[in-house]
Amino acid sequence: MSSYWRLWPIGTKPTRGSNHILYSNDQIGERIRLTTDLPISHFFQEESWTIISENKYLVLTYDAAFESAIAGTCEDFLHKTISYWQRWIKRCSIPNIYQTEVIRSALVLKLHQYEDTGAIIAASTTSLPEYPGSGRNWDYRYCWVRDSYYVLTALTHIGQFEEMESFANYIAGITHRNPGRLQPLYGILGNSELTEHILPYLKGYQESGPVRIGNQAFEHIQNDVYGQAMIALLPLFTDQRFKIHENKNVLGWVNFILEKIEATIEEKDAGIWEFRNFANHHCYSNLFQWVGCKAALLIARQNGYQDMEDRANVLLKRQKLTLKLVMTRSEKSIKTH
């Protein structure tokens, strides 16, 4: 909902139905319907009320009527949801040690992949404060290329590979639509414009604002993303259980990443800490560019791409020299201070 509830408290008209309440806002032409098997009169009372030993159901729909039998439909949805996750976790290779913790962690990671596109988001909500009152409340409901590598690695370690294939399609779609440099993060649909805004009319978690939507980091230059993208998808190109290496588009995608690494080896960036006000040379960025070249070398050798192998070798040598130079600068800076 694009208005983020800004206009709902003003001009919102609750309309009472037989088993629902319809909230309409004529200013923005939007409606929300709450359908329930509870007495509707309860919702118009100022007193609190308690349900004892009964299952009751509430369904919130956006501008649509809920026409099915509410109890049966909700129970059916619940059963199907539980069954889906039980089947998924049964397919995971999880040892007995810390099994409970690993299962819960795996479910959380899986829940953060948007099934329609393969995007993996860093958080399911926005603006939880890093520390109460600090003002460092950010919107992480986006797909960070860097973070996706670690999520996919964790999932493949427990035998889940479909997530990697879905993410590969997501990244391929982004690079096809936007042949320029890779951003550090994208929206779940691959959208690149993530302008940051503060919502002053929301108080935030435990009144520790501000509440932000969007993230300015989409404008940052973070050159480690090319290496991160390459190694995140490396198993797809080198593991014989996957067929992606037989796709002719693979060669073009890997060369695209190598081109970006070649163009940004000596470039300053915002680094892993996403500094908002200045750019510098960062060992981390150069290291992952080197890792990306090593991954390209493995892909080239396994699939017989001689031109790619030669190109990756040249970039590896250049990147090695650049990394040494950056580390030397860092050592001198530490001694100076």
Language model features by range: what are they?
Residues 1-337:
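Acidic, mature catalytic/reactive cores of soluble proteins
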